[in-house]
Amino acid sequence: MKVGHGCVRLEKRGEEQISLFDEYIYVEYNEEEYKKVVRSIKHKISEEAYACVYYACLSSEQDALDTAYRFLIKGFKIGSDITFMRNDPDVMRIKDIRRKVLHETRYFMEFARFNSIDNKVYVCHLEPESDVIYEVSLHFADRMPSENWL
């Protein structure tokens, strides 16, 4: 059995076909562990590195989580300089993923249109590729605080 970072791959559950020869470990969400990881990324690497990883987690790209994992391994070794290493393939890829997610977020902020239902609630239908609904909802919560909207 092989061990080490080179033998680990992160992916979202249900995204890939299951292989007969791989071992799958499903990780459940833990609020305490989440806070520790976020704090470690921000303090040991940088805020920008955290932002890159955050947007990679929102991405629909198949390799996004694995790229974030590889980026973090290098980031914890190198420190805050990792975000400036544009010749590294993992850094280039995570920056590209971040750019795509931010572009999709801005697209829905600009082009989302709401329809009024009985003058009580505004409804907008969005089908983003990435998980950007939360980011878009923050924008509209700020712009339409007195309205009821979905």
In which residue ranges do the predicted regions lie?
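N-terminal ordered "arm"
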Residues: M1-E31
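Extended, charged helical/alpha-beta scaffold domains that provide interaction surfaces
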Residues: V27-L150
